[in-house]
Regions:
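Aromatic-rich, lipid-facing transmembrane alpha helices and their immediate juxtamembrane interface loops
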Residues: 1-240
């Protein structure tokens, strides 16, 4: 609760930046993307300044990995495209802001909620694949399950799976970006957006958590790792 209180204003600012920024980018064609990019980097800088030294490696790792991932997915693989055919400068810091917001939400989720998310998503993914509208979905869903299996930070991945889907639905509805109906290289189909698109965000977070596991023992960034770390310390103390 202390962490939520400390960053409550930042969380609200992140939500406003994402929701308002995408709206401005779409409807203020001349300078909207420039204005939103400047805003996103300012909010990122504010988050960086307010974060302690233990949190900053995760924010930096998220920024670098997200930038590389965006370049590959949109420019090389071409599974989606932004409205101007570029990677907007607000996208890399936007990933960091969404990642941080996800960690704050994940901290408040009850135990095993990740499996509830997985169970609710499964029939929808299966239905869209069965009718041929989103045959990419099962592959992405398997990627999501792999993230749940590979790391103890399961609540974070479940949070990002849902949070990113909400953002994807909003962004594609506005027209900020569009997913291609035929997935290059794989010959699969995809809805706009794919229901399990959040799996890409989960992979990003898995890489961030894996690279900065020691720093992420802070409860503000990785509640699952923090709980595991605290339980281990308590067990060791009881044996002394």
């Amino acid at each position: 609760m202390r962490i939520m209180g400390e960053f409550g204003t930042m969380n609200a600012l992140i939500i406003a930046t994402v929701a308002g920024g995408l709206l401005i980018d779409q409807h203020w064609a001349l300078y909207g993307q420039v204005a939103v990019s400047a805003l996103a980097w300012i909010v990122f800088a504010a988050l960086w300044m307010r974060s302690g030294r233990e949190r900053r490696p995760a924010l930096a790792a998220c920024l670098l990995i997200a930038t590389a991932g965006e370049a590959f997915l949109s420019l090389v693989w071409g599974v989606y495209a932004y409205r101007l055919g570029n990677i907007p400068l607000f996208v890399p810091p936007g990933h960091v802001l969404l990642f941080f917001l996800g960690t704050q939400i994940a901290e408040r989720l009850p135990a095993r909620s990740e499996w509830v998310v997985a169970a609710l998503a499964l029939p929808l993914v299966g239905l869209l694949a069965w009718n041929g509208r989103d045959t990419l979905g099962p592959l992405l869903y398997a990627l999501f399950l792999a993230c749940l299996w590979l790391s103890p930070s399961r609540r974070l991945y479940a949070t990002m799976f849902v949070l990113s889907l909400a953002m994807e639905l909003y962004g594609t509805w506005l027209g900020n970006w569009v997913w291609v109906p035929q997935v290059p290289w794989l010959g699969l189909t995809a809805t706009n957006p794919p229901l399990a698109a959040g799996a890409f965000y989960c992979v990003l977070d898995l890489l961030v958590v894996s690279l900065t596991a020691r720093q992420l023992a802070s409860p503000g960034l990785n509640p699952s790792v923090a709980s595991h770390h605290a339980a281990t310390c308590k067990a060791r103390s009881s044996l002394r």
